[in-house]
């Protein structure tokens, strides 16, 4: 009987020890789980913080981009505006009246330059000079005195020019280019019958004291 009681007590003690071990193991597991959860929470918080900082950096990096684009657009717009004012606006600041005045000056000047008679050379040259300015005026004086006048007197050359058409090629407040189409008849002592010639001239003008004057005369 005593041995049986001893065995029962022994088994009870063993069972109690097993239960205590299981309980301790369970508590250890719970503690480990709680520690893991805490670590996970800490890691999750750290990751969120890191993502927040990364996102903030991206925002800081990306925010200047629209500003740069705006600045580039403003610069581009300013450059476009400058080009418009520099190249195109002056044409628009001149009205149709200015264009007609430039065409008239180019036409009258062309007729004066290409028309002369041996009997009225001085008057013809003076009329032509009144339409000229700048270096071209100096060139015309030299050319007529050295070339045109001697030939006109010697051969009795007489030329008469008529403008057929004229149109503005470029127009600015203080300068213009006009394309002029001319018919010219010429007679001489050796050829009394008029010979006709058609030509075109690019006439460059400058506004001097409010008047359009020819500064270049280029056959084309």
UniProtKB/Swiss-Prot annotation:
Q: Where is the composition biased (Polar residues)?
A: 39-48
Protein name in the entry: Uncharacterized protein MT1407
Keyword Transport assigned to the entry: answer is no
Where is coiled-coil annotated?
none
Recorded topology in the membrane: Single-pass membrane protein
Query: Keyword Glycoprotein: yes or no?
Result: no
Q: Which residues cross the membrane?
A: 65-85
Instruction: Provide the species name.
Output: Mycobacterium tuberculosis (strain CDC 1551 / Oshkosh)
- In residue numbers, the region (Disordered) covers 1-50
UniProt-annotated location(s): Membrane
Family named by the database record: To M.tuberculosis Rv1363c.
Cellular component terms per the entry's GO annotation: membrane
Keywords assigned: Membrane, Transmembrane, Transmembrane helix
Lineage top rank: taxon? Bacteria
């Amino acid at each position: 009987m005593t041995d049986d009681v001893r065995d029962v007590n022994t088994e009870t003690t063993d069972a109690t020890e097993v239960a205590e071990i299981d309980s301790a193991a369970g508590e250890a597991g719970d503690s480990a789980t709680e520690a893991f959860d805490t670590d996970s929470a800490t890691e999750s918080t750290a990751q969120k913080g890191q993502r927040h900082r990364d996102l903030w950096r991206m925002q800081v990096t990306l925010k200047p981009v629209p500003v740069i684009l705006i600045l580039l657009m403003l610069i581009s717009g300013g450059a476009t505006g400058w080009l418009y004012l520099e190249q195109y606006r002056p044409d628009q600041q001149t009205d149709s009246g200015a264009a007609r005045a430039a065409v008239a000056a180019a036409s009258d000047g062309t007729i004066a330059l290409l028309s002369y008679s041996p009997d009225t050379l001085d008057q013809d040259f003076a009329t032509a000079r009144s339409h000229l300015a700048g270096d071209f005026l100096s060139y015309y004086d030299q050319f007529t005195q050295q070339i045109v006048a001697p030939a006109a007197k010697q051969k009795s050359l007489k030329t008469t020019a008529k403008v057929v058409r004229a149109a503005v090629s470029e127009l600015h407040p203080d300068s213009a280019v006009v394309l002029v189409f001319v018919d010219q008849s010429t007679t001489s002592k050796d050829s009394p019958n008029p010979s006709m010639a058609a030509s075109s001239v690019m006439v460059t003008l400058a506004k001097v004291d409010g008047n359009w004057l020819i500064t270049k005369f280029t056959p084309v």
